[in-house]
UniProtKB/Swiss-Prot annotation:
Belongs to the class-II aminoacyl-tRNA synthetase family. It is found in: Cytoplasm. Keywords: Aminoacyl-tRNA synthetase, ATP-binding, Cytoplasm, Ligase, Nucleotide-binding, Protein biosynthesis. It comes from Halothermothrix orenii (strain H 168 / OCM 544 / DSM 9562). This is Histidine--tRNA ligase.
Length: 419
């Protein structure tokens, strides 16, 4: 047996897992500040949900989904993104009947079959938000501000915000016709994938990173010139709210995102040092998605951020997160009677909120002290038969080397004072 993880997956081990915990805890605090509540959905859904929600002509649905047939003959897919599942839950549980807006956040693994590379895996992790029940452009600005707040708390401020409006289905259809005509006149310059997209979904071509395609796209019609009055005013209002918050942004008329459900506002937060795959956050409005999935017309907006890519950006920037994997106390024991007593003290210390460890390998005092040093223990408590007989233990400050004796009867209270 080849004992290794499947290609495109990654074990997250200490101390790296501490970074993940810090990022997730930071995000949770900010979600709470913005009144977003956690939702947890299954990691697999019926395949039709993603076909209808994401769009059958998207790269995700056509090429990247992990789809299989279960023992009941049902087509099941591991979720490639989070929004469709949250929308399904919102509709299934009739949350739309409650007071709106409804604000959710989620954190969890997603799955896409694509070529593994820096910051991209076949099992990857996202944290994201979804807000339902309001078409207020102020909510669009809030979602963008929330994403920036997370990055700011993590120390990543050297980012750029890009926004666009891809309109409603009516004005987007007019634009799509004009774009298709233009692209057909330059079809010989398009890459193989874009030629295939031309008849299926020409807007996807705007997202192509191929150099020659980018040159063609540069002179293509701009969707902002085709917005209806309502969509134009909505986009102008979004910009005004961003201005009100002092958020700097750039309007990018080629920004369409890779999913079919987006309407009106689309945005990305980019960190240019990541190269071609520089988008950390991505999101936008999806006012037609609830109707596409469940025949209920309810506006929605959200974003997702890839945690692996976020950590890559933090590492590129040299940002050291304030994580701590050290412990407060390591109990060094001499003899079996002392070990039994120390085992109980270890439990009592933990119960009082102190992180504590004890030797489980029967090592010498010297080896136990080395182990205490490796764990980053702030203090060691040395307990042997003589300490039990005298009712006193030796406590050593591992930073200064200072040693003091304390009464075993007061051990917990005294250690609480020290740590």
């Amino acid at each position: 047996m080849d004992v290794k993880a499947p290609r495109g997956t990654n074990d997250i081990l200490p101390p790296v897992s501490l970074k993940w915990q810090y990022i997730e805890d930071t995000a949770r605090r900010i979600f709470q500040m913005y009144n977003y509540k956690e939702i947890r959905t299954p990691i697999f859904e019926y395949t039709e949900l993603f076909q209808r929600g994401i769009g059958e002509t998207t790269d995700i649905v056509e090429k990247e989904m992990y789809t299989f047939e279960d023992k009941g003959g049902r087509s099941i897919t591991l979720r490639p993104e989070g929004t469709a599942s949250v929308v399904r839950a919102f509709l299934e549980h009739k949350i739309y009947g409650q007071v709106q807006p409804t604000k959710y956040f989620y954190i969890g693994p997603m799955f896409r079959y694509e070529r593994p590379q820096a910051g991209r895996f076949r099992q990857f992790h996202q944290l994201g938000v979804e807000a339902f029940g309001s078409n207020d452009p102020a909510l669009d600005a809030e979602v963008i501000a929330l994403g920036l707040d997370i990055l700011k708390r993590l120390g990543l401020t050297d980012v750029e915000v890009f926004i666009n409006s891809i309109g409603c289905p009516e004005c987007r259809a007019r634009y799509s016709d004009e774009l298709k005509q233009y692209l057909e006149s330059h079809q010989d310059r398009l890459c193989k994938d874009c030629k295939a997209r031309l008849n299926k979904n020409p807007l996807r071509i705007l997202d192509c990173k191929n150099e020659e395609c980018s040159l063609v796209i540069k002179n293509a019609p701009k969707i902002l010139d085709y917005l209806c009055d309502n969509c134009r005013v909505h986009f102008e209002d979004v910009q005004e709210y961003l201005d009100l918050l002092g958020i700097k942004y750039r309007v990018d008329p080629t920004l369409v995102r890779g999913l079919d459900y987006y309407t009106n506002t689309a945005f990305e937060i980019k960190f240019k040092e990541l190269g071609a795959q520089d988008a950390i956050f991505g999101g936008g409005r999806y006012n037609g998605l609830t109707e596409e999935i469940g025949n209920k017309s309810i506006p929605g907006i959200g974003f997702a951020v890839g945690i692996e890519r976020l950590i890559l950006a933090l590492d590129k920037k040299g940002i050291k997160l304030p994580v701590n994997d050290s412990i407060d106390v390591y109990l060094v024991t001499i003899g079996e009677r002392a070990k039994r007593a120390a085992f109980n003290y270890t439990y009592l210390l933990r119960e009082s909120g102190i992180t504590a460890e004890i030797d489980y390998l029967g090592r010498s005092i010297k080896s136990q002290m080395k182990s205490a040093d490796r764990t980053g223990a702030s203090y060691t408590i040395i307990i042997g038969d003589s300490e039990l007989d005298s009712g006193k233990a030796t406590v050593k400050n591992m930073r200064t080397g200072e040693q003091v004796e304390i009464m075993l009867a007061n051990l917990i209270e005294e250690m609480q004072k020290l740590v």
